[in-house]
A protein has these predicted regions:
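Alpha/beta-hydrolase fold catalytic core
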Residues: 2-78, 99-102, 140-141, 333-335
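The serine-hydrolase catalytic nucleophile loop
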Residues: 81-94
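Conserved alpha/beta-hydrolase
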Residues: 99-116
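Conserved acidic catalytic loop of the alpha/beta-hydrolase fold
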Residues: 125-143
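Flexible "cap/lid" loop of the alpha/beta hydrolase fold
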Residues: 160, 169-208
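Conserved alpha/beta-hydrolase catalytic His-Asp/Glu region
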Residues: 209-272
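Conserved loop-alpha-helix segment in the C-terminal half of the alpha/beta-hydrolase fold
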Residues: 274-312
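Catalytic active-site module of serine/aspartate enzymes centered on a nucleophile-bearing elbow/loop
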Residues: 302-335
Length: 335
């Protein structure tokens, strides 16, 4: 009996050792492949066919933005989402539709696109300051701001601290409306330092870029975009996301995002409810966030309006553009 147990134990140990060895070899092989064969300085085209300029933010460094100043009126400022491979390209349908009708601006947020991608601390405060600095220095008058997904939190932070910079705020598929049980889980994770530990693990130089290369591979980008589209993802959307993810320093900001450090705890109660500017939320279904608590906020806050554009999955301005354009125009016409 003892011999049998020993043989089984030895077999299990050898199997585990073999699996560990295979995994280690695979990881090591991918690290080598990433360093030697994946291009990290691809030519990067402009995200939009418009004038591109740089602005030096006191708090956030060099920020790239696209502008069409051919018409007068209330400035429209577009803020892309934050994920593994975002850029101003995400806001292209809105930029193209409203250009020529009013001044339109689309930013590459810090760490993305043509903006500065240095190895530094990326935080909600950094993005809040980047937005505020841009609105003060480049726009110079109250603007209509349209933000996508997590950037809604950054825009809301800026609007609560300096409301005079905003005429209105539009949130497309915003984060921050998870049910209380999920907020509590996130708060406990932060209290335990889980996010910091995850960031520390992901940011180890030897595998930080190789890990990001996995997340930003073409199949990975295609997969995640498929989750956000009702219908087919435009091929050029995938192409540009891949381009912008293969630039020097492209891994730094997404590492903070992937470790959960760019989300503001209890943003609904501490930030969203404090907004005093007109707010429009455009939403439907989204695989990456939850709108369970949105109806309650719409009931509580008279300055908030919700518009459900169905069927869409997170990028309604791509999936149902004409309906989104009309919803926006109707909202702004009432201001």
């Amino acid at each position: 009996m003892n011999k049998t147990v020993k043989k089984i134990g030895k077999g299990v140990a050898l199997t585990v050792a073999g699996v560990v060895g295979a995994v280690t070899a695979a990881v090591g092989g991918w690290i080598v492949f990433s360093r030697k064969y994946i291009q990290h300085d691809m030519p990067l085209d402009k995200a939009l066919e418009a004038e591109r300029q740089d602005f030096l933010s006191q708090h956030a460094g060099r920020i790239s933005y696209y502008a069409d100043r051919s018409s007068k009126g209330t400035p429209l400022v577009l803020l892309h989402s934050v994920n593994a491979a975002p850029s101003a390209y995400e806001m292209k349908p809105l930029f193209e539709h409203f250009r020529g009708q009013r001044p339109v601006f689309a930013l590459d947020l810090p760490g993305f696109g043509f903006s500065e991608r240095s190895d530094r601390l990326y935080s909600p405060l950094l993005y809040q300051n980047a937005i505020s600095d841009f609105l003060k220095a480049v726009i110079g008058k109250p603007a209509d701001v349209v933000a996508l997904s997590l950037s809604c939190e950054f825009a809301a932070l800026a609007a609560t601290h300096e409301p005079e910079l905003f005429r209105s705020l539009v949130m497309i598929s915003p984060t921050g409306f998870n049910p209380p049980r999920m907020d509590k889980m996130a708060s406990r994770a932060k209290a335990r330092g889980s996010r910091s530990k995850l960031y520390a693990g992901l940011a180890v130089p030897v595998w930080n870029r190789p890990f990001y290369d996995l997340v930003s591979s073409r199949p990975s980008i295609q997969y995640f975009l498929n989750q956000s589209f009702e219908g087919l993802v435009p091929e050029h959307f995938v192409d540009y996301a891949y381009q912008t993810a293969h630039q020097p320093g492209a891994q730094y900001a997404p590492t903070y995002f992937l470790s959960g450090k760019l989300f503001t705890p209890a943003v609904r109660e501490t930030v969203y409810q404090a907004l005093d500017r007109p707010v429009l939320v455009i939403y439907d279904r989204d695989p990456y966030t939850n709108f369970e608590m949105l109806p309650a906020l719409l009931r509580e806050c008279d300055n908030w309006i919700g518009a459900r554009i169905s069927p869409t999955k997170g990028l309604p301005h791509w999936e149902a553009p004409q309906r989104v354009f009309k919803t926006l125009t109707d909202f702004w016409s009432e201001l």
